[in-house]
C-alpha cells in the first residue's frame, strides 16, 4: 500500500515538534494523527497539557497548537503493507521537506 503523510499541524509560534514516521492505516483513513483507539498519544498529551482527550479532533489539535506543539512525520510517502515501520519498503521512502517547514 502506498502511503502519503498528513499535513503538518503547527503554528508559527510552535516550539516543540513531535515527529512520527508515517501515520498508521487508521490515521490515514480518518485523516487524523494518532487515530487508532489503542494509541495513547492523545490521552498522554491531554494529561500533560490539561485538555479533554475525548474532545473532537479539531479541538485536540487546537489545544496542541495553543501549547506550542506541532505534529508531523519524517516521511512524506512510502510503501508498506501494514502500519508497522518495519514493513516500510526502504526503496520507496520520500522524506518530508524539513527545510521548507522550518
What kind of region is each of these model predictions?
Residues 1-102:
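A polyanion-binding, active-site-adjacent surface
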Amino acid at each position: 500500500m502506498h502511503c502519503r503523510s498528513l499535513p503538518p499541524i503547527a503554528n508559527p509560534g510552535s516550539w516543540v515538534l513531535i515527529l512520527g514516521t508515517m501515520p498508521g492505516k487508521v490515521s490515514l483513513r480518518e485523516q487524523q494523527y494518532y487515530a487508532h483507539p489503542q494509541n495513547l498519544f492523545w490521552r498522554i498529551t491531554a494529561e500533560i497539557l490539561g485538555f479533554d482527550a475525548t474532545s473532537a479532533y479539531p479541538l485536540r489539535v487546537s489545544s496542541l497548537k495553543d501549547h506550542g506543539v506541532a505534529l508531523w512525520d519524517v516521511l512524506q510517502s512510502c510503501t508498506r503493507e501494514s502500519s508497522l515501520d518495519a514493513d516500510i519498503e526502504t526503496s520507496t521512502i520520500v522524506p518530508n521537506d524539513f527545510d521548507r517547514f522550518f
